[in-house]
Amino acid sequence: MAREGFFTGLDIGTSSVKVLVAEQRNGELNVIGVSNAKSKGVKDGIIVDIDAAATAIKSAISQAEEKAGISIKSVNVGLPGNLLQVEPTQGMIPVTSDTKEITDQDVENVVKSALTKSMTPDREVITFIPEEFIVDGFQGIRDPRGMMGVRLEMRGLLYTGPRTILHNLRKTVERAGVQVENVIISPLAMVQSVLNEGEREFGATVIDMGAGQTTVATIRNQELQFTHILQEGGDYVTKDISKVLKTSRKLAEGLKLNYGEAYPPLASKETFQVEVIGEVEAVEVTEAYLSEIISARIKHILEQIKQELDRRRLLDLPGGIVLIGGNAILPGMVELAQEVFGVRVKLYVPNQVGIRNPAFAHVISLSEFAGQLTEVNLLAQGAIKGENDLSHQPISFGGMLQKTAQFVQSTPVQPAPAPEVEPVAPTEPMADFQQASQNKPKLADRFRGLIGSMFDE
């Protein structure tokens, strides 16, 4: 059951920082304030400059406060899946009260018993998701409080991450003047918010196409099956445009947003002017030519994702592929993705008034996830916070939950390094361009032989 109140989500991205304030009332989430500020001090989704990132966060929070008309004291901040480890665990305690009635304290204690795992000093528990409680052998219990029993067991999934990344995240947010209410694993929030009940049950994949990285999350049977990070995103498309057309990064971003088409068959032959470095006059370029540059990078990203999904037999899930994120807004993105994946692909657009934009799907999911946390979830989080204040102690670890043994959590979810690739200058689309502007500098001549193949490694 959803909690009522105000929930603030904080999405710290490579290109922008988004803050969203939502009020949950009568089971409905209503957005009352949202902001989008330029990001600083963040690279590939990871904070690399605490002061710069804190300044950007503070600016975004101030904007959101002004629009929402409230003072923001704490936030629910998203954590990317970089170097995430997930593993099943279980705990068991005796119920020691005289009445044998299970209380909040018993729930906290059984969670703590599940956390008694030997962990290296460089890792920290992010969250613990209880899957079921068992009271005196009776399974499938969601909330055991108020029940009577002599033995309480619990099974769930334990999520851990690099201590340094978590420390930097909390310190940055606190330096911006607010407290961290919850650290929420972004892939978990995304699949819960973006997908419907049927998609989460039968299986679907969400692809968040950001500026600095692309995040993949697959869910099936209501459980997160796979997460993957590619250190390539919309910024790499902009870099390719800048390099091939020999124009500034700022102008290249404008060309992408104003004339970009991800699927070349849909691109027009219309021309536009480009200021080229080293040229006195602007050069005419066709939208079709620009589309070839854009699609080459995006296709490269999607093909890497397809390989990962194919390896794990997760490509042909009934729910297909769902695209979100700022880079997913490009026209033709769905068509290109369908061509690459060969399955149903759709673009998710939030239905909240005023922010019907896939770029806000992530920050919305953070507020929604926080609002959906049950009292049992909050008790588990409280137990984790208490344990994280203590030094990790090498204590024997309980039995593993077998039903999720095939999940990739047994190994770290490593971010795939961005390959050193070079953009290719398209040649075929230039034929029409040359006919339309015979007196203009010939881009095909300038770039012919620049690079043989965009993705030769």
Curated annotation (Swiss-Prot):
GO CC term (a single one): cytoplasmic side of plasma membrane
Coiled coil: none
Subcellular location: Cell membrane
Name the UniProt record assigns to this protein: Cell division protein FtsA
NCBIfam families noted in UniProt: ftsA
Assembly behavior: Self-interacts. Interacts with FtsZ.
UniProt-listed GO biological process terms: FtsZ-dependent cytokinesis
Assigned keywords, A-Z: Cell cycle, Cell division, Cell membrane, Membrane
InterPro entries given in the database record: ATPase_NBD, Cell_div_FtsA, FtsA/MreB, FtsA_C, SHS2_FtsA
Family in the record: Belongs to the FtsA/MreB family.
SUPFAM superfamilies given in the database record: Actin-like ATPase domain
Membrane topology qualifier: Peripheral membrane protein
Keyword Cell cycle: yes
Function of the protein: Cell division protein that is involved in the assembly of the Z ring. May serve as a membrane anchor for the Z ring. Increased expression restores growth to a PBP2b (penA) deletion strain as well as mreCD and rodA deletions, but not gpsB or rodZ deletions. Does not restore wild-type cell morphology to the penA deletion.
Induction: Protein level is negatively regulated by KhpA/KhpB partly at the post-transcriptional level via its 5'-UTR (at protein level).
Keyword Cell membrane: yes
